[in-house]
From Swiss-Prot:
Catalytic activity, as annotated: P(1),P(4)-bis(5'-adenosyl) tetraphosphate + H2O = 2 ADP + 2 H(+)
Enzyme's top EC category: hydrolase
InterPro entries registered for this protein in UniProt: ApaH, Calcineurin-like_PHP_ApaH, Metallo-depent_PP-like
Keyword terms: Hydrolase
NCBIfam families: apaH (TIGR00668), PRK00166.1 (NF001204)
UniProt lineage: Bacteria, Pseudomonadati, Pseudomonadota, Gammaproteobacteria, Enterobacterales
Keyword Cytoplasm on entry: no
Family, as annotated: Belongs to the Ap4A hydrolase family.
Record organism: Buchnera aphidicola subsp. Acyrthosiphon pisum (strain APS) (Acyrthosiphon pisum symbiotic bacterium)
The protein's name: Bis(5'-nucleosyl)-tetraphosphatase, symmetrical
Molecular functions per Gene Ontology: bis(5'-nucleosyl)-tetraphosphatase (symmetrical) activity
Pfam family, one: Metallophos
Keyword Plastid: no
């Protein structure tokens, strides 16, 4: 029994299945942890989600910003843009069932025995582990609720970038969503920056990668995340494991087997992704 970590599949189904074959992933014995962004940009979002749905309890998923966008598009809250490649998914007779399954996924996974954490964008350096768990549960509860569309209408907000215990309920939810699915850099005071996507090679003070900020969590846990294809594994100290290698941008899909620390990779197959 092995545990594999991957992120940002982005609808690149063929590359994903080849990578599973390369790693000898066994869907009857092994476990797959996915750090979000299953869909969008690549052409086969429906195939990716249907396959993961079929794995049942063999897959552990946290949602990324593109997964949230798919749910919002399906609910009629956001426009379906061409670059999303959502048409096949939205027209599928299985779309409602799959969307409802996605809505019940997590924003944070914690394995206390192995001291492993997984989220899509990362963990706010302003949080300790207990606050992070509570904040994840709060937005998971809202997204899985039957009135989730109202939650999604209110959750998008760029100015909620600093954590305080006295945030009102809605702003608390907005901060949590921004932290789990959108951040890359922080300012020295801990404020999130959700807009800069460049490699740290090209970014100067006052911005710092969130994982280089002081944090009590990284002293205890190994942290897996995606969301940041321009990072390319550089400037990332232990115990952080970046998983987004930019397959949908013509780079590659990567996966780590936890037990022996072996990495597997599969280059994109054709210029079919955006």
């Amino acid at each position: 029994m092995s545990t594999y970590f991957i992120s940002d599949i982005h609808g690149c189904y063929e590359e994903f299945r080849i990578l599973l074959e390369k790693s000898s992933f066994n869907d009857k014995k092994d476990y797959l942890w996915i750090a979000g962004d299953l869909v969008s940009r690549g052409p086969d979002s429906l195939k990716v989600v249907k396959y993961l749905y079929s794995l049942k309890d063999r897959v552990q998923i946290v949602l990324g910003n593109h997964d949230i966008n798919l749910i919002a598009v399906h609910a009629g809250i956001k426009d379906n843009k061409k670059e999303n490649y959502f048409d096949e998914f939205l027209s599928s007779p299985d779309s409602v069932e799959l969307i409802n399954w996605l809505r019940c996924q997590s924003f944070l996974k914690v394995d206390e025995k192995r001291k492993i954490i997984m989220s899509h964008a990362g963990i706010s350096p302003q949080w300790d582990i207990n606050i992070a768990k509570v904040c994840a549960l709060e937005i998971e509860d809202r997204l899985s609720h039957k009135n989730y569309a109202l939650f999604l209408k209110e959750i998008y907000h760029n100015n909620i970038d600093f954590w305080r215990l006295n945030l009102n309920q809605l702003d608390r939810l907005r901060y949590s969503m921004n932290s789990f699915t959108r951040m890359r850099y922080c300012y020295p005071d801990g404020r999130l920056n959700m807009f800069c996507k460049k490699s740290p090679d090209f970014v100067k003070y006052p911005l710092r990668p969130w994982f280089l900020m002081p944090s009590s969590i990284s002293k205890v846990y190994s942290i897996f995340f995606g969301h940041w294809s321009s990072l390319k594994g550089t400037h990332v100290p232990k115990p952080f494991f970046p998983l987004d290698a930019g397959c949908c941008w013509g780079e590659e899909l990567v996966m780590l087997r936890w037990e022996d620390g072996k990495w597997f990779s599969q280059a994109y197959l054709s210029k079919k992704c955006i």
